[in-house]
């Protein structure tokens, strides 16, 4: 008992000592804010989430060129359009398709009937809903424009669904991936011919005496979606030429520009920049006059003419390497472009000379060998220089050749008074060659139409695995001979656009996170 009392006394003394040593902690230097502590002297605002740094973007535009996306084909103005408008589907630089305005789609079992529905949340900058009528009117108007019409070759009808909520596309041949062609910006049905129609994109064009700007849409239907452009207002600088665009980028405030190295007006950039190369769809090629040229009477020449075309040297000498030499009608990075197959038809002067030995060169009534006449558009100086060099090279290898340089290129082309022509065309994203080979096709002059190649083209549209067979047959036949493929060059001030991922016709490409499989409705069985 005495030990127990002694223990209690010791504990009591210890408690007293501890209480005497305890100091009251002064918490007045800290202010609780829920998820953070502020040090003495700090304001609560100091720990507020920081807004993303302003980019202070400035873009160039041509005020005298169209800003209606259904008619405006200028690639500088289309930079603005990629922020002002949205398509049913966006296509990245690798040809991957992502839904934007499309909220759902159906496809028939035979892939010839496609139905698309607008995302029910989609709105224009004025708050009105995007409708199926708008989509239909947009595509009907786009079909009239040379810039888009090549993607409509196999679309034979477009109508609203019975309930008016969707748009039906009827095709004359099965399509594996019709959405790849449906990246046309959608505008209101009542504004398809407006100078600057309203769009559903994150920015709206505003003009004033103090200058034009792109202003961020405050209540954008996509909310706070992160896109490459973050400014609330983007300044615009009016320009008048490609050289002006370059100078505004190199010495002025312009942040992002797009150029076409295959254009006669291309201005070279000589400053510090970040660069993206985006396939443009522009293909330079040779077309043969099978119907009227004596050089192609027996079809021999076109089977080996490809070996006499020094594509790599032409691309380097006349475009400073800013074009891709090709022997197949597709961009080299395309999944359809088979390099092993392409290499079989590349430049080989020895093979050309060897094959030329078994070819009978036509002669005139005096026994003089006829020149192979190369028609070329005299308004394209780079193409003229290539045609001249080609004529010189062929002549040196034993095939006399000369150029026919015409300012009225189309008239001479339709007259078909040439042997071959050095042409330029813009292929759709699926590299459709229909107009070369279908009966009475717009690009079939000189007898290029060909039933077998036309059917093989349709087979490739139905199943992309058939492109190899199509390209092999075409390269062996040689009625059209690809020379080089172009790309756009997108320049940005270094470090300014870390999230930029430009695509053809869509410099400010972005995705909403939707997927094709996620919005597909059950297949329709006929």
For the regions a language model picked out, list residue spans one by one:
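Extracytoplasmic/peripheral linker and loop segments enriched in polar/acidic and small residues
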Residues: 43, 50, 402-409, 434-497, ...
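N-terminal lobe/hinge region of extracytoplasmic solute-binding protein
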Residues: 60-109, 140
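Gly/Pro-rich hinge or "lid" segments in bacterial periplasmic/extracellular proteins
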Residues: 170, 175-235, 243, 524-525
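Ligand-site clamp/hinge motif
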Residues: 220-267
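Periplasmic-binding protein-like
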Residues: 291-335, 470-480, 484
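Structural transition elements
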Residues: 323-361, 379-383
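Ligand/substrate-recognition segments at binding pockets and active sites
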Residues: 359-427
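Long beta-strand-rich cores associated with HINT superfamily self-processing modules
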Residues: 493-526
């Amino acid at each position: 008992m005495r030990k127990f009392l002694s223990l209690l006394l010791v504990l009591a003394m210890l408690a007293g000592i501890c209480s005497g040593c305890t100091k009251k902690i002064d918490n007045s230097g800290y202010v609780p804010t829920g998820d953070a502590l502020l040090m003495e002297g700090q304001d609560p605002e100091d720990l507020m989430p920081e807004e993303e740094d302003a980019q202070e973007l400035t873009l160039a535009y041509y005020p005298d060129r169209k800003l209606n996306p259904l008619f405006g084909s200028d690639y500088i103005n289309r930079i603005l359009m990629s922020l002002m408008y949205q398509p049913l589907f966006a296509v990245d630089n690798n040809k991957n398709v992502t839904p934007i305005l499309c909220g759902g789609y159906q496809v028939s079992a035979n892939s010839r009937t496609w139905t698309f529905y607008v995302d029910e949340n989609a709105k224009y900058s004025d708050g009105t809903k995007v409708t199926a009528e708008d989509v239909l009117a947009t595509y009907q108007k786009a079909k009239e424009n040379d810039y888009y019409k090549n993607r409509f070759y196999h679309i034979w009808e477009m109508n609203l669904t019975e309930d008016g909520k969707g748009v039906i596309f009827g095709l004359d041949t099965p399509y594996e991936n019709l959405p790849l062609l449906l990246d046309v910006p959608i505008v209101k049905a009542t504004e398809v011919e407006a100078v600057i129609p309203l769009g559903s994109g994150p920015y709206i064009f505003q003009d004033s005496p103090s200058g034009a700007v792109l202003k961020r849409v405050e209540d954008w239907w996509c909310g706070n979606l992160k896109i490459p452009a973050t400014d609330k207002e983007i300044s615009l600088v009016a320009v008048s030429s490609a050289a002006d665009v370059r100078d505004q980028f190199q010495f002025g405030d312009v942040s992002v520009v797009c150029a076409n190295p295959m254009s006669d007006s291309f201005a070279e950039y000589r400053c510090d920049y970040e660069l993206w190369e985006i396939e443009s769809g522009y293909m330079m090629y040779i077309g043969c006059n099978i119907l009227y040229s004596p050089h192609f009477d027996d079809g021999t020449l076109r089977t080996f003419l490809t070996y006499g075309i020094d594509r790599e040297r032409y691309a380097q000498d006349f475009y400073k390497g800013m074009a891709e030499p090709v022997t197949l009608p597709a961009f080299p990075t395309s999944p359809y472009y088979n390099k092993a197959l392409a290499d079989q038809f590349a430049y080989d002067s020895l093979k050309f000379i060897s094959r030329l030995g078994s070819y009978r060169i036509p002669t005139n009534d005096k026994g003089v060998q006829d020149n192979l006449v190369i028609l070329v558009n005299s308004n394209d100086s780079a193409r003229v220089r290539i045609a001249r060099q080609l004529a010189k090279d062929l002549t040196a290898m034993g095939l006399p050749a000369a150029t026919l340089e015409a300012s009225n290129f189309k008239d001479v082309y339709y007259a078909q008074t040439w042997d071959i022509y050095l042409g330029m065309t813009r292929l759709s994203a699926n590299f459709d060659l229909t107009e070369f080979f279908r009966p009475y096709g717009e690009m079939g002059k000189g007898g290029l139409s060909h039933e077998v190649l036309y059917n093989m083209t349709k087979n490739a549209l139905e199943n992309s695995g058939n492109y190899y067979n199509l390209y092999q047959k075409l390269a062996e036949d040689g009625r059209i001979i690809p020379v080089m493929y172009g790309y756009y060059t997108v320049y940005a001030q270094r470090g300014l656009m870390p999230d930029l991922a430009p695509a053809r016709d869509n410099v400010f490409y972005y995705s909403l996170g939707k997927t094709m499989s996620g919005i597909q409705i059950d297949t329709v069985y006929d």
